[in-house]
């Protein structure tokens, strides 16, 4: 029985990156032998055991065989005769198909170390094509290691997988799981570049793929191309280390520009409402969680208004707060301001240009929150007990006055 550290832990150690999780493969052992040594069995599809002290996962070496489309169509085989190389060859990329033994010796049968040095993602074998999730994994790794490129033969294989319909067999939850993980990496735009290059983005997110080649007014968008702009916005959100819902909102905020009739280009009048509708559709299809969906829909609908915030009247601002449910969910509204600021900065030459609208709207919201709705409601019930409709009107007017005072102070300080 021999135990090896495998996969990402070996890769990251060679790269000088902090190792977070270690995966172990056990060669030459049976489940009965593992249990006899006090390992706890936890695997459903194949034998995985928890170490009795560290509780880290140890998997018996295994092979796998494709039996149906998609990422679930596999039969696994494991016994004491499966070799380390047989286990490693089923892995996705050469850089993830290395192992380290107890003496610290690196076992690298597929040239992973060479590809690490050359910063190349290359598939281990033709078995890569059996699991469409691997396309998403390669794209996600590109977002984590943006200096790496995908080998030409690997990209060609991914293109063939897309053409064969393998990507269409992915379940929505798994697609979103991988996209979300990629969005949280250091340079999410690399993930989408890889997905576009192999044609997978058009199958998974046609609404997003449609943005490349769609022009915007150069006066406001020196980068011109909408797809390029959206990638800059998402990368800015990553640079600011913002939460997943904000990155998701950054990704989807301009989907409506992809359906603007070409004769209207480069203008996109009314794209905000179109964007909001498309975001709803995408989130429903991919089963995207509610926090990401709600913020993305709101950002798509309102980012134009936030951009014009300094021109809005107090009454319009309060109506916007009410429409966004900002009094019950103020943090979500602030997150939307953050996403809108990413939209502003995600343009060529605008990365360091101030965006006073964020602080301006937060100040306005804070002023509106000082209004005591309960007191106003009690007073109105005393004066007009038979006219309950006047209560929300009175609260609205009080908030408008508070906001007007606050924004007037901002515009005319001192």
Swiss-Prot record:
InterPro entries, alphabetized: CCA_bact, HD/PDEase_dom, HD_domain, NT_sf, PolA_pol_head_dom, PolyA_RNA-bd, tRNA_CCA-adding_enzyme
GO biological process: RNA repair; tRNA 3'-terminal CCA addition
Key words, A-Z: ATP-binding, Hydrolase, Magnesium, Metal-binding, Multifunctional enzyme, Nickel, Nucleotide-binding, Nucleotidyltransferase, RNA repair, RNA-binding, Transferase, tRNA processing
Pfam families: HD, PolyA_pol, PolyA_pol_RNAbd
Cofactor annotation comment: Magnesium is required for nucleotidyltransferase activity.
Oligomeric and partner information: Monomer. Can also form homodimers and oligomers.
UniProt family annotation: Belongs to the tRNA nucleotidyltransferase/poly(A) polymerase family. Bacterial CCA-adding enzyme type 1 subfamily.
Additional information: A single active site specifically recognizes both ATP and CTP and is responsible for their addition.
The record's note on its domains: Comprises two domains: an N-terminal domain containing the nucleotidyltransferase activity and a C-terminal HD domain associated with both phosphodiesterase and phosphatase activities.
Role: Catalyzes the addition and repair of the essential 3'-terminal CCA sequence in tRNAs without using a nucleic acid template. Adds these three nucleotides in the order of C, C, and A to the tRNA nucleotide-73, using CTP and ATP as substrates and producing inorganic pyrophosphate. tRNA 3'-terminal CCA addition is required both for tRNA processing and repair. Also involved in tRNA surveillance by mediating tandem CCA addition to generate a CCACCA at the 3' terminus of unstable tRNAs. While stable tRNAs receive only 3'-terminal CCA, unstable tRNAs are marked with CCACCA and rapidly degraded.
Alphabetical list of HAMAP family matching this protein: CCA_bact_type1
Record protein name field: Multifunctional CCA protein
Organism: Herminiimonas arsenicoxydans
């Amino acid at each position: 029985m021999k135990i090896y550290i495998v996969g990402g832990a070996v890769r990251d150690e060679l790269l000088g990156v902090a190792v977070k999780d270690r995966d172990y493969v056990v060669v030459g052992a049976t489940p009965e032998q593992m249990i006899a040594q006090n390992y706890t069995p936890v695997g459903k599809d194949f034998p995985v055991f928890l170490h009795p002290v560290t509780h880290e996962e140890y998997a018996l070496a295994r092979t796998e065989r494709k039996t149906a489309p998609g990422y679930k169509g596999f039969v696994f085989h494991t016994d004491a005769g499966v070799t380390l190389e047989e286990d490693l060859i089923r892995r996705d990329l050469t850089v993830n198909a290395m192992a380290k033994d107890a003496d610290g010796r690196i076992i690298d049968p597929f040239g992973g170390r060479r590809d690490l040095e050359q910063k190349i993602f290359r598939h281990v074998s033709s078995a890569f094509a059996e699991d469409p999730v691997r396309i998403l994994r390669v794209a996600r790794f590109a977002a984590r290691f943006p200096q790496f490129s995908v080998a030409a033969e690997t990209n060609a294989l991914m293109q063939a997988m897309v053409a064969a319909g393998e990507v269409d067999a992915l379940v929505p939850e798994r697609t979103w799981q991988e996209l979300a993980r990629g969005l949280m990496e250091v340079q999410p735009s690399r993930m989408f570049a890889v997905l576009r290059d192999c044609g997978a983005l058009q199958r998974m997110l046609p609404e997003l793929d449609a943005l490349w080649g769609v022009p915007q007014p150069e006066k406001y968008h020196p980068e011109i191309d909408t797809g390029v702009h959206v990638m800059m916005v998402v990368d800015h959100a990553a640079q600011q280390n913002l939460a997943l819902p904000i990155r998701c909102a950054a990704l989807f905020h301009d989907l409506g520009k992809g359906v603007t009739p070409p004769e209207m280009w480069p203008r996109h009048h009314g794209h905000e409402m179109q964007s909001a509708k498309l975001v709803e559709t995408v989130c429903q299809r991919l089963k995207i969680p509610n926090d990401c969906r709600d913020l993305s829909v709101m950002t798509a609908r309102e980012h134009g208004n936030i951009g014009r915030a300094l021109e809005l009247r107090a009454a319009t601002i309060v109506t916007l707060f009410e429409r966004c449910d900002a009094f019950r969910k103020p943090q979500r509204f602030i997150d939307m301001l953050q996403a809108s600021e990413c939209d502003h900065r995600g343009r060529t030459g605008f990365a360091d240009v101030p965006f006073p609208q964020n602080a301006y709207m937060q100040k306005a919201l804070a002023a509106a929150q000082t209004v005591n709705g309960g007191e106003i409601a009690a007073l109105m019930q005393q004066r007009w007990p038979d006219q309950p409709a006047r209560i929300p009107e009175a609260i609205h007017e009080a908030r408008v006055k508070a906001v007007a005072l606050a924004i007037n102070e901002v515009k005319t300080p001192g």
